[in-house]
């Protein structure tokens, strides 16, 4: 039986941003390290059950981005994906991560791949969960969303429509056969943070910047081909934004990647932790330190 892990909750100042993070303390001091990069509209809280499941065996570290969760949201922060990556890259340096794998989910894909491009020699492997890096992985709705411009009439209203409790909850429930397995604290806590002063404007800015990620897809694909990191791909196949073709598309650049699809939506960890956690553990055990 696995031991109950010690989980720590800390905050560190990164260039004027109070970055909150949670980390597990494994029993072995040289345990593999996995940096958990969350998505939208959530924060490190989304990894709580994974950390309690695997935290005794691995050092799992999950920061909240600026404007998300318990991390501060300065008005003058650069709410772009470059800005998020700058902060998390500085966070990696501050806490002294030298060799680590990354768990990329949703927004964690663009953030993590920017970090990987800056420090390729530190990356031991990638766990990729509904984190798209291919045109084939964009649904029609996602294509329309990423094409939004601040100059488009009604564009900001469209974005803000996703930032309501109804919009947040639907991201959890869409594609889930049995919503009874979903804990309501996920979308409830997400909405609490979205409703804090300044948070929705930060999300609007990030939404308008999302096209920068699509433009970067070819460069990220080239990075994957060049460095060929070990990869585990776990994917909610019924994700309304990033459907199953996005998972298979990685095989063009990472032909040795392991792919597992699950009959669920965007937040696959919320519904399929018992299936995904052992896959992550087996993957981490195989990585070179």
Stretch-by-stretch model annotation:
Residues 1-28, 33, 41, 61, ...:
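Flexible "cap/lid" subdomain of the alpha/beta-hydrolase fold that forms the substrate-access gate
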Residues 264-277:
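Catalytic histidine-centered segment of alpha/beta-hydrolase-like enzymes
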Residues 40-51:
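The serine-hydrolase catalytic nucleophile loop
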Residues 66-69, 265:
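Adenine-nucleotide cofactor-binding loop residues
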Residues 56-60:
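A generic structural motif
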